[in-house]
Regions:
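C-terminal, low-complexity/hydrophilic appendages and adjacent surface loops
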Residues: 18-19, 93-176, 182
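Low-complexity, Gly/Pro
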Residues: 25-27, 178-185, 189, 193
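A structural signal for well-ordered alpha-helical segments within the folded catalytic domains
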Residues: 44-51, 66-69, 109, 156-159, ...
Protein backbone atom coordinates (compact mmCIF):
# COMPACT_ATOMS: atom_id res chain seq x y z
CA UNK A 1 0.00 0.00 0.00
CA UNK A 2 1.24 3.48 -0.82
CA UNK A 3 -0.65 6.57 0.36
CA UNK A 4 -0.06 10.28 0.24
CA UNK A 5 0.19 12.14 3.55
CA UNK A 6 -2.80 14.39 2.91
CA UNK A 7 -4.53 16.09 0.04
CA UNK A 8 -3.04 18.95 -1.96
CA UNK A 9 -0.80 21.59 -0.44
CA UNK A 10 -2.61 24.33 -2.33
CA UNK A 11 -5.05 26.95 -1.04
CA UNK A 12 -7.92 25.24 0.79
CA UNK A 13 -6.00 21.96 0.95
CA UNK A 14 -3.28 21.19 3.48
CA UNK A 15 -4.01 22.52 6.99
CA UNK A 16 -7.76 22.25 6.42
CA UNK A 17 -10.45 19.60 6.64
CA UNK A 18 -11.87 20.54 3.24
CA UNK A 19 -12.03 17.70 0.75
CA UNK A 20 -8.89 18.76 -1.13
CA UNK A 21 -6.99 18.79 2.18
CA UNK A 22 -7.98 15.34 3.38
CA UNK A 23 -8.77 13.41 0.20
CA UNK A 24 -5.58 11.40 -0.17
CA UNK A 25 -4.41 9.07 -2.90
CA UNK A 26 -3.78 5.39 -2.21
CA UNK A 27 -2.29 2.69 -4.42
CA UNK A 28 -2.30 -0.97 -3.52
CA UNK A 29 -0.75 -3.94 -5.26
CA UNK A 30 -1.21 -7.54 -4.18
CA UNK A 31 -0.79 -9.90 -7.15
CA UNK A 32 -3.29 -12.76 -7.34
CA UNK A 33 -5.31 -11.27 -4.47
CA UNK A 34 -6.41 -7.77 -5.53
CA UNK A 35 -7.75 -7.24 -9.06
CA UNK A 36 -5.34 -5.29 -11.23
CA UNK A 37 -6.49 -1.85 -12.41
CA UNK A 38 -9.31 -1.56 -9.90
CA UNK A 39 -10.56 1.82 -8.75
CA UNK A 40 -12.77 2.55 -5.76
CA UNK A 41 -14.53 5.58 -4.37
CA UNK A 42 -15.30 3.85 -1.06
CA UNK A 43 -14.81 5.99 2.04
CA UNK A 44 -11.65 4.89 3.85
CA UNK A 45 -9.68 6.40 6.68
CA UNK A 46 -6.07 5.96 7.77
CA UNK A 47 -7.36 4.34 10.99
CA UNK A 48 -8.68 1.49 8.82
CA UNK A 49 -5.22 0.45 7.58
CA UNK A 50 -3.97 -1.40 10.68
CA UNK A 51 -7.21 -3.38 11.17
CA UNK A 52 -7.01 -4.35 7.50
CA UNK A 53 -3.44 -5.62 7.84
CA UNK A 54 -4.38 -7.55 10.99
CA UNK A 55 -7.34 -9.09 9.15
CA UNK A 56 -5.32 -10.01 6.05
CA UNK A 57 -2.62 -11.57 8.24
CA UNK A 58 -5.23 -13.88 9.76
CA UNK A 59 -5.89 -11.96 12.97
CA UNK A 60 -9.21 -10.71 14.28
CA UNK A 61 -9.25 -6.89 14.45
CA UNK A 62 -12.48 -7.00 16.51
CA UNK A 63 -10.48 -8.49 19.40
CA UNK A 64 -8.15 -5.49 19.47
CA UNK A 65 -8.82 -1.97 20.71
CA UNK A 66 -8.56 -0.27 17.32
CA UNK A 67 -10.48 2.76 16.08
CA UNK A 68 -10.76 1.67 12.46
CA UNK A 69 -12.25 -1.32 10.72
CA UNK A 70 -10.83 -3.70 8.15
CA UNK A 71 -11.45 -2.98 4.48
CA UNK A 72 -10.21 -6.44 3.44
CA UNK A 73 -13.63 -7.28 1.94
CA UNK A 74 -13.33 -4.20 -0.29
CA UNK A 75 -9.83 -5.18 -1.44
CA UNK A 76 -10.87 -8.74 -2.19
CA UNK A 77 -13.86 -7.59 -4.25
CA UNK A 78 -16.53 -8.82 -1.82
CA UNK A 79 -18.07 -5.34 -1.39
CA UNK A 80 -17.92 -1.92 -3.03
CA UNK A 81 -18.62 0.13 0.12
CA UNK A 82 -16.81 0.51 3.42
CA UNK A 83 -17.61 3.39 5.80
CA UNK A 84 -20.84 5.37 5.66
CA UNK A 85 -19.07 8.39 7.15
CA UNK A 86 -15.40 9.25 7.68
CA UNK A 87 -13.96 11.87 9.99
CA UNK A 88 -10.96 14.19 9.78
CA UNK A 89 -9.19 16.41 12.27
CA UNK A 90 -6.66 19.22 12.08
CA UNK A 91 -5.43 21.30 15.00
CA UNK A 92 -2.89 23.54 13.25
CA UNK A 93 -0.89 23.46 16.46
CA UNK A 94 2.86 23.72 16.33
CA UNK A 95 3.09 24.57 12.64
CA UNK A 96 5.37 27.26 11.29
CA UNK A 97 3.70 30.67 11.72
CA UNK A 98 0.54 28.93 12.88
CA UNK A 99 -2.05 29.92 15.43
CA UNK A 100 -1.61 28.68 19.00
CA UNK A 101 -4.41 26.31 18.04
CA UNK A 102 -7.12 26.26 15.39
CA UNK A 103 -9.04 23.04 15.82
CA UNK A 104 -11.02 21.80 12.82
CA UNK A 105 -13.16 18.66 12.65
CA UNK A 106 -15.06 17.26 9.69
CA UNK A 107 -17.36 14.43 8.70
CA UNK A 108 -18.30 13.33 5.19
CA UNK A 109 -20.60 10.76 3.70
CA UNK A 110 -19.04 11.27 0.27
CA UNK A 111 -21.76 13.65 -0.90
CA UNK A 112 -21.82 16.16 1.95
CA UNK A 113 -18.88 17.53 3.92
CA UNK A 114 -19.64 19.02 7.33
CA UNK A 115 -16.85 21.09 8.92
CA UNK A 116 -16.77 22.37 12.48
CA UNK A 117 -14.22 25.10 13.24
CA UNK A 118 -13.79 25.06 17.02
CA UNK A 119 -11.82 28.32 17.08
CA UNK A 120 -13.93 30.28 14.60
CA UNK A 121 -13.61 33.35 16.84
CA UNK A 122 -9.91 33.54 15.90
CA UNK A 123 -8.08 34.17 12.65
CA UNK A 124 -6.57 31.15 10.95
CA UNK A 125 -2.89 31.66 10.20
CA UNK A 126 0.05 29.68 8.92
CA UNK A 127 3.11 30.12 6.72
CA UNK A 128 0.86 30.89 3.74
CA UNK A 129 -0.75 33.89 5.45
CA UNK A 130 2.60 35.21 6.72
CA UNK A 131 5.28 34.48 4.14
CA UNK A 132 3.78 33.39 0.85
CA UNK A 133 3.87 36.04 -1.89
CA UNK A 134 0.98 34.26 -3.59
CA UNK A 135 -1.38 34.87 -0.66
CA UNK A 136 -0.19 38.48 -0.41
CA UNK A 137 -0.93 38.91 -4.12
CA UNK A 138 -4.45 37.50 -3.65
CA UNK A 139 -5.12 40.22 -1.09
CA UNK A 140 -4.41 42.86 -3.74
CA UNK A 141 -6.96 41.50 -6.25
CA UNK A 142 -9.99 43.76 -6.10
CA UNK A 143 -12.86 41.43 -6.95
CA UNK A 144 -15.65 40.07 -4.78
CA UNK A 145 -14.51 36.50 -5.45
CA UNK A 146 -10.87 37.17 -4.47
CA UNK A 147 -11.92 38.99 -1.29
CA UNK A 148 -14.31 36.17 -0.38
CA UNK A 149 -11.56 33.53 -0.82
CA UNK A 150 -9.01 35.48 1.26
CA UNK A 151 -11.59 36.11 3.98
CA UNK A 152 -12.75 32.47 3.94
CA UNK A 153 -9.16 31.30 4.41
CA UNK A 154 -8.40 33.40 7.49
CA UNK A 155 -11.88 33.70 9.01
CA UNK A 156 -13.86 30.47 9.24
CA UNK A 157 -17.50 30.06 10.17
CA UNK A 158 -18.21 27.88 13.21
CA UNK A 159 -20.00 25.40 10.95
CA UNK A 160 -19.62 24.77 7.24
CA UNK A 161 -21.42 22.39 4.90
CA UNK A 162 -20.47 21.66 1.31
CA UNK A 163 -22.13 19.63 -1.43
CA UNK A 164 -19.13 17.75 -2.81
CA UNK A 165 -21.05 16.72 -5.92
CA UNK A 166 -21.74 20.31 -6.99
CA UNK A 167 -18.90 22.08 -5.15
CA UNK A 168 -15.83 19.80 -4.86
CA UNK A 169 -13.57 22.76 -4.05
CA UNK A 170 -15.71 23.70 -1.02
CA UNK A 171 -16.29 27.29 -2.07
CA UNK A 172 -20.00 27.70 -1.18
CA UNK A 173 -20.86 27.21 2.48
CA UNK A 174 -24.40 25.82 2.72
CA UNK A 175 -24.51 25.53 6.53
CA UNK A 176 -27.72 26.89 7.98
CA UNK A 177 -29.59 26.81 4.66
CA UNK A 178 -33.12 25.42 4.84
CA UNK A 179 -32.56 22.98 1.98
CA UNK A 180 -29.49 21.41 3.64
CA UNK A 181 -30.76 21.14 7.22
CA UNK A 182 -31.13 17.35 7.10
CA UNK A 183 -27.60 16.67 5.79
CA UNK A 184 -26.04 19.12 8.26
CA UNK A 185 -27.94 17.69 11.24
CA UNK A 186 -27.08 14.09 10.30
CA UNK A 187 -23.33 14.72 9.96
CA UNK A 188 -23.25 16.92 13.06
CA UNK A 189 -24.90 14.12 15.08
CA UNK A 190 -22.45 11.57 13.70
CA UNK A 191 -19.56 13.81 14.72
CA UNK A 192 -20.96 14.17 18.24
CA UNK A 193 -21.59 10.43 18.68
Amino acid sequence: IFTSEQGSAFFGGKWTCYDTGVHAAAILRWPSKVAEGGVSDALLSYVDVVPTFVDLAGGNPAELDLDGKSFAALLLGKTKRHNEVVFSVNTTRGIYHGSEAFAIRSATDGRWLYVRNLHSDKKFQNVITHKEPIFASWKTIDTDFARSRVNAYIKRSAEELFDLRDDPWCLKNLAGKKETTKAQALLSRRMDA
